[in-house]
């Protein structure tokens, strides 16, 4: 402790009383050192094992609705096995999208006529995609399926930039014999995209 040695009478340990304390101070090497035996009245109040009744009356806290089993089955809470659900598109669904459009670009009629058009694709009958491609207007095929002039749609290039490898005279750190490359700090546009 800072502030110098603590006198024995300030420590929470047992010590001799009266003349025995004076004899102890004469005989020991360090009189200010305590015996190390804690005072029973001041040590670990409440002692361990004292509150057995409180421990027996303990009730596990339950949070509602998370702890409620009804309406909260395990398979809904099981995030370890919550894999993405696989959805497929068959020829009937694709034919329906081509004929009736999508939510962003609908071509379906309003009202009862629209329900009849939709029933063709939802009643479980298989619709051939080849016959649908023949029957849909050319603007759908050349605009949504293919490009505007009938060319196939190509995915955009992900290599929009390339890194330039600096030669040894530019970076001046390693010779060409050392197998270490240094790249530019900025991306340089490739000639094809420029």
From Swiss-Prot:
UniProt keyword annotation of Oxidoreductase present: yes
Keyword tRNA processing attributed: no
GO biological process: mitochondrial respiratory chain complex I assembly; mitotic cell cycle; regulation of cell size
GO molecular function: oxidoreductase activity
Alphabetical list of InterPro entries matching this protein: NADH_Ub_cplx-1_21kDa
Recorded superkingdom: Eukaryota
Cellular component per GO, a single term: mitochondrion
Phenotypic consequence of gene deletion: Reduces mitochondrial NADH dehydrogenase activity. Leads to growth defects on glycerol and oleic acid, and shows reduced oxygen consumption rates. Decreases the mitochondrial membrane potential. Shortens the chronological life span (CLS). Leads to sensitivity to both cell wall-damaging agents calcofluor white and Congo red, as well as to thermosensitivity. Also increases the sensitivity to oxidative stress agents H(2)O(2) and menadione, as well as to osmotic stress agent KCl. Impairs the yeast to hypha transition.
Keyword terms of this UniProt record: NAD, Oxidoreductase, Translocase, Ubiquinone, Virulence
PANTHER family membership: OXIDOREDUCTASE 21 KDA SUBUNIT, PUTATIVE (AFU_ORTHOLOGUE AFUA_4G05910)-RELATED (PTHR37325:SF1)
Function noted in UniProt: Fungal-specific subunit of the mitochondrial membrane respiratory chain NADH dehydrogenase (Complex I). Complex I functions in the transfer of electrons from NADH to the respiratory chain. The immediate electron acceptor for the enzyme is believed to be ubiquinone. Plays a role in cell wall integrity and is involved in osmotic and oxidative resistance, yeast to hypha transition, and virulence via providing the ability to damage and invade host cells such as oral epithelial cells.
Name assigned to this protein: NADH-ubiquinone oxidoreductase subunit NUO2
């Amino acid at each position: 402790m800072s502030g110098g040695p603590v006198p024995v009478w300030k420590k929470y340990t047992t010590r001799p009383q009266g003349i025995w304390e004076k004899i102890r101070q004469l005989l020991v090497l360090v009189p200010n050192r305590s015996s190390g035996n804690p005072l029973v009245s001041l040590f670990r109040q409440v002692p361990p094992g004292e509150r057995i009744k409180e421990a027996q009356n303990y009730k596990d806290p339950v949070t509602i609705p998370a702890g409620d089993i009804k309406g909260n089955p395990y398979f809904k809470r099981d995030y370890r096995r919550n894999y993405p659900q696989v959805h497929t598109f068959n020829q009937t669904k694709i034919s329906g999208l081509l004929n009736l459009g999508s939510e962003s670009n609908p071509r379906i009629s309003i009202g009862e006529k629209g329900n009849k058009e939709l029933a063709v694709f939802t009643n479980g009958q298989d619709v051939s995609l080849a016959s649908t491609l023949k029957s849909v207007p050319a603007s759908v095929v050349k605009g949504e399926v293919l490009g505007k002039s009938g060319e196939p749609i190509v995915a955009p290039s992900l290599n929009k930039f390339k890194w330039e490898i600096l030669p040894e005279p530019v970076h001046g750190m390693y010779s060409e014999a050392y197998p270490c490359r240094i790249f530019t700090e900025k991306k340089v546009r490739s000639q094809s995209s420029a």
